């Protein structure tokens, strides 16, 4: 029998994940009947809509004129909302939408709770570390509001499962942070006729928009026909994020979702917009009018080229479409391991070398290796014609020079520039950066 290719194996894994999810759903359906009897006994309805508990629970929002009284609460209860991502955006949005009385929620996220998530992902607790985020979120929601049904999908959204999942829900909340996933969510939602509430956040800023509103509003591809270059995309782990800033975006996503579900927006009154939030120096929210649906859009335009078949058949590789960052910019001989560097600096040759740390100043101030020099990749290395002013006055470009960053990515680019632009002759990148140093050499160096 021929060996399966990596792509074939991944395809089989994705199909097995989907089959497993369907089996869980069927098993859940069996237990749901008895659960429903127990629920009905505990919360008997006092009319065709709600129990006494629900009237008390939601009363404070039903009396708000803009909300829309009883009929809007009924619309919330009948709605099914899918959250793609249970992280910094998804957690606050889940918290407020489940509390508001959405009837059924789906959560898809293949990630596990990590302690580094807890400062901003407010549904997860210290006890949740190590379990799937969607399961952690479900536990919290079940305690918060027993009237909400929660479905979990502890795997990654893909071409193979996206249609089966998204078509079950009325509204999609895109709480992800990668362009490839955003394009997949957009394309499948447009084809399925679903409105998307989309948010993003990084550092102290964030933005929010409503996409494909009732099929008449612009979609993500209308705004961004081409993805950003891979090198320009910064993740939370690289760029950092202040919890309340991204939390505010998640909360506003929940409010916009309520407005969509309760028909506050209509086909006549909805205008495409982009809300942009800045947390520093002075908090502000600016709202920009966006262009309408584009006739030449690849998925929602007059002659679409992105179709259900092209997605389901994996004719579109979203990671390839958005570009892949090459993890190995340098030739192998220009890189060394942390152990090799450790051995070198503890040898007789180590005294005649220099270590350049290219992390941002804020990261360098958290922790650093002794005798290193901080010259940040961005903005210093990127913009500089030379770095002579940062180096000792007697520095010789034949000196053995080592370059370190946080994970071993920026340091490769800096090493390349030192050789090609600055004329350094003996330069090596330290693979894995200071994070790897902490794991393998010195655990007293904190991982952050």
UniProtKB/Swiss-Prot annotation:
Keywords recorded for this protein, A-Z: ATP-binding, Cytoplasm, Metal-binding, Multifunctional enzyme, Nucleotide-binding, Nucleotidyltransferase, Transferase, tRNA processing, Ubl conjugation pathway, Zinc
Active site as annotated: 236, 405
Positions that bind Zn(2+): 219, 222, 297, 300
CDD domains, alphabetized: ThiF_MoeB_HesA_family
Presence of keyword Zinc: yes
Residue ranges constituting the Rhodanese domain according to the UniProt record: 349-446
Protein name: Adenylyltransferase and sulfurtransferase UBA4
